[in-house]
């Protein structure tokens, strides 16, 4: 199997080393081929080179080495090794593959033992290492004893290692008895990988399941995801470990792990005793990566002292099981984990048997990132994040929300939830003694959401001031949604919102509000954290908002009210422990963010009195009764209308010396105003749609009458109609689109013409809120026109009359935002009658190229009505019948021109329209669940408008004529278009 070229490579390497001792760096060509240990007829020539001036090995073709084993040799070696100087392996676009390599020295595939210099692997199409093993070596000692020495790294470098400009890099199922299942180096730089970069199922019995470094790990500017999948370390760092006590250890300040400007960073299914994904004795930073994901990494088990004495416990036993995804701790300086300018950051289902389900660190900083999510991580303490003594936390939601949800920690107390017979409780962040939060802020439209609580341990030597939402543009939300949140800080709120969801507690040393607002839901508590020793704390609130829906629900109000109430009220609470003084001033606000509270019949359909706020002013020193408060906002303009009155009463559940008061709010109902989703203006506006469909039939009739004169004939026309009315203050608009056909027959009797027509249209309408409808309309028409000469052959008089009846079926769907969609059908009836007269004036053909000028005046009477009908379902409405009448008078002039060479005709008409009379009854609507009734009018079409119409006729034969007809009508806030194309057969 191509043995000779590789033996020549071995000889050339030795010769180059001997000849270049005093000259330039060696440049050696690597032979191509496949070298399979199972078929080689001679031992594989393991190659060791070294040149103080450096060595560059250049690939001359793709090379694959597999099934090689020198693990029990007297002198086990790597396939390629370097002893001195810089070492570079240049691929020149070829592949380098190692498979099933077995040895008992550092670097089963490649090793660099040079004490200084740089090891570079570059420019390969593919670098792949599969199933390579570096086993324990047995070293003889004096006295006939032996010592077992573990081997490190499938690729090993005593100095810095660089992997760059390689299209595909993969390390699969490699195993080492020491550190670095795939790579063990002083520092490692991975840069410019283009198509694949995967470290999968590598195992190190000590540290760094995939990679271990003793100084710096850096992955920068890679165009593909860096994937660390299912790697295992017996001690630290299932994926990556930066360890200060490794081979060639650097100082603690040299250590760091950095990922910057990569397409993606992925750690999934890695495991170790400490740091399931990453372990570092220095800082860890993520900067500018498009996506960073840590999923299902595990740090386990914790250290258990043996029952029998003997032996020394491991130095890091206290950290066993810490850092399910990331472990970062520096005993000398702050070990910081930072995420800056990241696209997406996602931690989910990571598990720590000890502390920090996702992250264990001394300092954590998240800033200028897109969405950041910690979901479903689990630990004994610090479900998502654990920060050690004197730790620091900085959270800034700049380009996306920061969310903690479903993270759990183990509990030893009763009453906690049970998962697989283990008592657990929600927990986002745990901070040990002396910790502080330095930044907590969210940009406008962003939020930091604690669906799991954050807890700080007592014992801060100096209480720090935390300014929430500090900085220009930080007016977002800090939301505490579950559990007991404890912040041993003096909180200052200058802008944005602090929100407490139902049954949530927020305990702080003090809170001063100079701006922004505090939002509380029913059952939430804002209280003082108990410090040791006790401190004189205070709260000063000036802008407090309450969720009305939550208060009503937690008060258990009903319609009609019950006495006693059906449940014990659960108002918001401020200052429950009486460990400080509380002042609250300025107006308070009732908020109905989803606009449902004022539309709930069970809540505000009757007069109510609810408990809003239980306020403990503090017992030391005694405080006066709270000042009267006013309501800063009125009730909603939709739903139930009424007024609130506020009143303080002593809290009967607490003794007077506690200075506890209850703020009660009394509601007096005065009426009901339906919201835009309730109104259903489409019902009454459908009457206009029926009139428009009949008018389109009349336009088709008018087009069939014009054209060349004939005795009798039949015609057919396709028609379309579009009408739009602007939205009103409620957002209610109207759009009607219909199309169909019209067919008719005309017959002349002297100077008079009589005709019949049938029209069928199919339409769609919507109100631009939540209603849309389909309709089907049938129209029957009869029409008569006459024309008489008044003065010779130039002046004539004509008149016409048209009458139509239309019957339409409407099918409306209402897509509520708060309830299921409803469907209902009803019928419309419509009658339209037109009369008109004109004064046709014949013109000489040379004048304005016109043949006829016809001033005219018309009168159109339209009447439409809809029947009574009732919806079904929880949101059912009953609609009474309604009608619409309109008298319209168009006045205008029509111009006709006939071609002098062809039997074609062109017609143009312009008219001013005045609606002289209109009556709209409106539709009486009843919301059955509320027993509330209102009347909805159809929109009032502007009384004045203009209309233009044009037609063109072309005779195909002496008996067949085709034509097109279009019209446009404009009124203030509305416009309509119509088009018809048809054909006539003359007899």
Curated annotation (Swiss-Prot):
Pfam families found in the cross-reference section: Autotransporter (PF03797), Chlam_PMP (PF02415), ChlamPMP_M (PF07548)
Principal subcellular localisation of the protein: secreted
Location in or out of the cell: Secreted, Cell wall; Cell outer membrane
Span of the signal peptide: 1-25
Source superkingdom: Bacteria
GO CC annotation terms, alphabetical: cell outer membrane; extracellular region
Transmembrane segments: none
InterPro entries per UniProt: Autotransporte_beta, Autotransporte_beta_dom_sf, Polymorphic_membr_middle, POMP_repeat
Membrane topology field: Peripheral membrane protein
All copies of domain Autotransporter, residue ranges: 707-987
Alphabetic keyword roster: Cell outer membrane, Cell wall, Membrane, Secreted, Signal, Transmembrane, Transmembrane beta strand
Keyword Cell inner membrane appears in the UniProt entry: no
Record-stated family: Belongs to the PMP outer membrane protein family.
The name this protein goes by in its record: Probable outer membrane protein PmpG
Source species of the chain: Chlamydia muridarum (strain MoPn / Nigg)
Biological classification of the source: Bacteria, Pseudomonadati, Chlamydiota, Chlamydiia, Chlamydiales
